[in-house]
Amino acid sequence: MATNAKPVYKRILLKLSGEALQGTEGFGIDASILDRMAQEIKELVELGIQVGVVIGGGNLFRGAGLAKAGMNRVVGDHMGMLATVMNGLAMRDALHRAYVNARLMSAIPLNGVCDNYSWAEAISLLRNNRVVILSAGTGNPFFTTDSAACLRGIEIEADVVLKATKVDGVFTADPAKDPSATMYDQLTYSEVLDKELKVMDLAAFTLARDHKLPIRVFNMNKPGALRRVVMGEKEGTLITE
C-alpha cells in the first residue's frame, strides 16, 4: 500500500489505558514504556499533528472493583480520577524529558499540581503545537475514561479518537480465548452495536456515534503503529458511519 507523504489527521485524541503503562509488572508505571510512548507522541508532534491525550487509571486504581467490595462507588471513582492525574503527571514528565512541550489539565481542580481543564485553553495550546494531557476523566463519577476520551475529542474538535489497546484492533471474538478470531479492518457504528463488539462502553460509544467522531482501535505495544495510523496506513480497526 502506498504511503501518504502527509498525515491524514490534523488533530487527534489519543486514549491510553492505564494498563498500557504498567508493562509486564501488573501494577504501577513502567518507565521504559512511558518513555517509548513519549517518543512516539514526539514523532507525531514533529509531523505537525496536534495531540490531545486522555489516560486511564486502571494500573493504579479501579473504582468499580472496590465498589463490589463495598466501597461507595462515588468515592471509588474519585480515587480513580486521581489515579489518572498521577498517570498524567508521569506522562507530562516523560514528554518534557523528550523535549516536548506538554500541558496537564484536570477535570477536578488541583491547584499547584496541574491546570484546571478549560476547553478554550486546550484548543489554544493545541494550535500552538503543545501536547495537552486531559486527566481526571470527565470529572464525574460513573463515567469511564473512554467516555472522557470521546467527550474531550468532540470538545477539542479532534479528527479521530485513537484508542490504544493491547490487541491489534477489533476482533470477531477475544483473540486470547479464540485462536480463530479474525480482525476487522473497518466497521460502522451500527455494526459494532449489532454484533455487540467490545470497543468501549456504551455511553462512550454512543457519544462518538451521535457526533460522528471516528474511532480507531490499534495496538500501542506494536512499535511504530501510532505513526502508521496517522499516516493512513493499514493499521488497526477504523469505526465510522
Swiss-Prot record:
Main location: cytoplasm
Taxonomic superkingdom: Bacteria
Keyword Cytoplasm: yes
EC number: 2.7.4.22
Family listed: Belongs to the UMP kinase family.
PANTHER family per the UniProt record, alphabetical: URIDYLATE KINASE, URIDYLATE KINASE PUMPKIN, CHLOROPLASTIC
Protein name: Uridylate kinase
